[in-house]
């Protein structure tokens, strides 16, 4: 079956949305223009999992979502419509705890002797002899002694006669050799149970000990997701066997790799994965998609960072594109005034670099102490492997490692001991230089040696008296092997630290404008000019033309249209400043006195107002009843978001020890200002009405760019209409697919749907359907076609982005092409009460330069109009007359 990747739709599978539910939507997705379903993880996960990333058995497909038979039914439906399937897989980690994960349970029962011990990234050696050879098991809900005394932790026998340690709803296996001693004279008391548990291959402990004591790599700081050693060939095959079987059987056509930066050797993993899939292509049935296997990696790229050239992948999952879109559609003139407003209202620093460093320091100390200790031990072992470095103390190495890890500005470098590229070398050099300012003079030799190891200098240089192996050394003490192990530990620490410090902390602390705080974006990153956006697109077309282009994901902080609405505030900072200050005065009586302070804190209050702007429904009837209904509908969503935001920020509450008093005060404030007798909802509705036209311009600009820039557009389920969602779980709410199918069947004219905000869902969906139909008619134009920036001049040039996609497959006077125009930063050019469109007088004498080969007659895809384009300067005002975007093809 021939199917060209044109557009994906991400579906979230769980017990409430199964393979059969997805199969019922295939016809709708096909009509919309989707070529591939992009499925969340489908392997057996924890009972009731809502996302599938907590895999318990990689050898089975989840029965909760339909099992193998359900998958086959879905694929059959896809094949009937000539569509493919991309599968999200989780090589980095598995769910752990009790016996729900068979491989983990076997490790707990047998320790290092388990045949599955090599699967998990466990550090079996411990300085404390009593813990050496044991798995730290931080799965108790309370202190170990209290759990034993209360009976929360106890021994029990199941119906089959097997004895377990039972804690809450989890069972932990008892060594076979200990079974005869149990229940011999009746049930053991707490002291006897303690002695028995002390003999096990694991050490049960309170969950709070994980950050300090855990001796296995976690996914971020989650104590129930254990790192998997896919760098081991046997583990790779064991964890991927079913995936390869599904690919060979033609049931899947590509893979999305979750958290690639967690792996020991991401590049090596990608090469091994590519080789295995390519080897299986000849075994695939004729009915399967005939394109090469797609491999897409979840990788957060810092500004200016690129995927390594030697990774054989199609590209990323699209967070980098999201960041570029955000940069393009925010007004650069609003950046510094918004920061000043934040500082004025909150009294907090507005420098993102200060906040990021503080967050990194806090997270490293409170969430990754055990991971830092493992990394320190790895470098200390490297130091001990040679006489020259044996006097580098563990304490000194810890101090300098702490400072360097904090200063690494990207998720990680890529070095497994064989060296790294110039970009990574510059990253390390910068981190070392910045760390030097925090290191005391006595630690500088340790910092210099660490710099040498990280820069790629051999652990033992050629020649010299100490270059020869010392007597009694084993292969395990080989300096190059030790350096490799230390480098891997270092890289597996910087990646989760970056994620937790920025995405899960700073984004909830510092928010001059919340639409900028999105996964893939950098705090305080500058906006993107049209020229810089063009450069990014040209670069993507050259290096990764089949990477995904995302605007929404299951992990986003805010939906694409939430962000586009808030982005308008960057264009009207003075008005926003007056408005938010008036809101604060209006709502001051609803604040709660708490321990001598008023709640909410101004920073939390400012974030709340932005969130309410983002989710408030547009197009309401101008009545109190309509506003009260809307307030009641969004209140639970916003309350859930706010509690999560307060805890993620780790300032006035947190996940470990929530300040329930402060949280309750904030909730009371929210309920008061959104109450039926409050005047605030009317003020909120007034502002949302005010910014809706410019917000819709942003929405259509973002949508058109996603569908026409180099790459494969990925549409997160439900975001084909306006997506005003918040962070999970809000962005994973069920979608009304029947409504969406009805909207599509109505075949709405996009321009006709602009007048009323109530029709904006239909307008966005119609734009998507029409452009995807264009892509279906000429897939190569958008996959391999050149990206040609078009010059715009005149008074409103900054408000237009223009480019062409030009076919490289056909030569001629007028090659197949599409010309794309999108309005941007439209707020100040739209008259009060106007439609989502910059009027002709707003464009004035702005011109777009049409190259000779692209001149001639054109068909406008979104309106059906026929346009004649002459070579040279062409008035923009005559092109953007019905919509704020144009997509036209030569005829």
Segment roles from a protein language model:
Residues 74-123:
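Hydrophobic or amphipathic alpha-helical targeting/insertion segments
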């Amino acid at each position: 079956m021939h199917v060209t990747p044109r557009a994906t739709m991400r579906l979230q599978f769980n017990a409430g949305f199964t393979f059969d539910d997805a199969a019922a939507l295939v016809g709708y997705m096909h009509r919309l223009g989707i070529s591939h379903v992009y499925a969340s993880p489908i392997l057996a996960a924890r009972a009731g999992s809502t996302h599938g990333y907590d895999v318990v058995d990689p050898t089975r497909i989840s029965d909760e979502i339909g099992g193998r038979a359900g998958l086959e039914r879905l694929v059959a439906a896809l094949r009937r419509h000539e569509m493919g399937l991309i599968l999200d897989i989780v090589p980095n980690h598995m769910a752990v705890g009790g016996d729900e994960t068979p491989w983990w349970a076997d490790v707990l029962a047998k320790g290092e002797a388990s045949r599955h011990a090599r699967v998990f990234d466990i550090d079996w050696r411990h300085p404390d002899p009593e813990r050496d050879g044991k798995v730290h098991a931080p799965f108790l809900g309370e202190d170990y002694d209290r759990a034993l005394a209360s009976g929360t932790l106890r021994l029990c026998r199941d119906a089959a006669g097997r004895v377990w340690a039972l804690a809450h709803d989890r069972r932990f296996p008892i060594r076979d050799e200990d079974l005869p001693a149990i229940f011999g004279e009746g049930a053991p008391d707490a002291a006897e149970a303690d002695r028995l548990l002390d003999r096990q291959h694991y050490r049960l402990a309170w969950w709070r000990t994980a950050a300090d004591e855990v001796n296995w790599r976690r996914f971020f700081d989650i104590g129930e997701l254990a790192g998997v050693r896919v760098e081991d060939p046997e583990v790779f095959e064991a964890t991927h066997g079913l995936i390869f079987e599904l690919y060979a059987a033609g049931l899947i056509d590509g893979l999305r790799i979750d958290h690639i930066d967690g792996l020991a050797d991401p590049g090596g993993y990608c090469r091994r994965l590519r080789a295995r899939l390519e080897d299986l292509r000849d075994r695939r049935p004729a009915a399967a998609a005939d394109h090469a296997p797609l491999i897409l990696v979840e990788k957060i790229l810092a500004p200016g960072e690129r995927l390594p050239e030697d990774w054989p992948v199609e590209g990323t999952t699209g967070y980098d594109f999201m960041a570029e879109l955000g940069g393009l559609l925010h007004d650069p003139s609003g950046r510094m005034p918004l920061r000043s407003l934040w500082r004025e209202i909150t009294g907090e620093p507005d420098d993102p670099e200060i906040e990021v460093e503080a967050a990194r320091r806090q997270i490293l100390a409170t969430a990754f102490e055990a991971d830092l200790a493992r990394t320190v031990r790895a470098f200390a072992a490297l130091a001990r492997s040679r006489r020259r470095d044996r006097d580098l103390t563990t304490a000194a190495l810890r101090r300098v490692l702490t400072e360097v890890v904090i200063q690494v500005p990207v998720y990680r470098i890529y070095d497994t001991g064989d060296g790294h590229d110039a970009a990574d070398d510059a990253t390390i050099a910068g981190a070392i230089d910045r760390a030097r300012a925090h290191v005391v003079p006595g630690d500088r030799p340790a910092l210099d040696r660490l710099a040498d190891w990280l820069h790629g200098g051999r652990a033992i240089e050629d020649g010299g008296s100490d270059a020869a192996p010392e007597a009694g050394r084993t292969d395990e003490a080989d300096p190059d092997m030790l350096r490799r192990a230390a480098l891997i530990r270092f890289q597996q620490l910087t990646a989760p630290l970056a994620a937790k410090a920025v995405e899960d902390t700073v984004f909830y602390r510092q928010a001059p404008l919340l639409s900028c705080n999105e996964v893939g974006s950098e705090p305080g990153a500058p906006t993107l000019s049209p020229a810089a956006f063009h450069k990014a697109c040209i670069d993507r077309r050259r290096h990764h033309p089949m990477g995904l282009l995302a605007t929404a994901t299951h992990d986003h902080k805010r939906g694409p249209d939430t962000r586009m609405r808030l982005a308008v505030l960057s264009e009207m900072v003075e008005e926003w400043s007056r408005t938010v200050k008036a809101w604060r005065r209006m709502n001051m009586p609803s604040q709660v006195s708490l321990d001598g302070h008023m709640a909410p804190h101004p920073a939390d209050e400012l974030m709340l107002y932005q969130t309410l702007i983002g989710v408030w429904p547009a197009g309401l009837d101008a009545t109190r009843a309509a506003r009260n209904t809307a307030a009641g509908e969004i209140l639970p969503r916003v309350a859930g978001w706010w509690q999560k935001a307060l805890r993620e920020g780790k300032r006035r509450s947190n996940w470990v020890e929530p300040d329930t008093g402060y949280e309750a005060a904030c909730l009371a404030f929210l309920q008061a200002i959104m109450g039926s007798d409050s005047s605030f909802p009317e003020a909120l509705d007034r502002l949302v009405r005010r910014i809706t036209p410019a917000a819709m311009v942003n929405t259509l600009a973002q949508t058109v760019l996603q569908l026409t820039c180099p790459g494969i557009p990925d549409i997160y389920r439900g975001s084909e209409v306006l997506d005003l969602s918040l962070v999970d779980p809000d962005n994973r709410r069920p979608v009304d697919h029947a409504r969406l199918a009805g909207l599509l069947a109505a075949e709405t004219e996009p321009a006709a749907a602009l007048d009323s905000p109530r029709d904006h869902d239909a307008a966005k969906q119609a734009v998507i359907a029409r452009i995807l139909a264009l892509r279906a008619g000429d897939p190569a134009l958008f996959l391999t076609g050149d990206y040609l920036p078009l010059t715009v001049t005149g008074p409103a040039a900054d408000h237009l982005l223009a480019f062409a996609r030009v076919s490289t497959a056909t030569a001629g006077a007028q090659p197949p092409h599409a010309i794309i125009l999108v309005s941007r930063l439209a707020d100040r050019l739209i008259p009060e009460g106007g439609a989502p469109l910059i009027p002709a007088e707003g464009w004035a004498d702005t011109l777009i330069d049409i190259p000779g080969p692209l001149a001639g007659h054109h068909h406008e895809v979104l309106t059906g109009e026929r346009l004649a384009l002459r070579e040279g300067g062409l008035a923009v005002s005559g092109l953007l007359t019905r919509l704020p975007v144009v997509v036209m093809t030569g005829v």
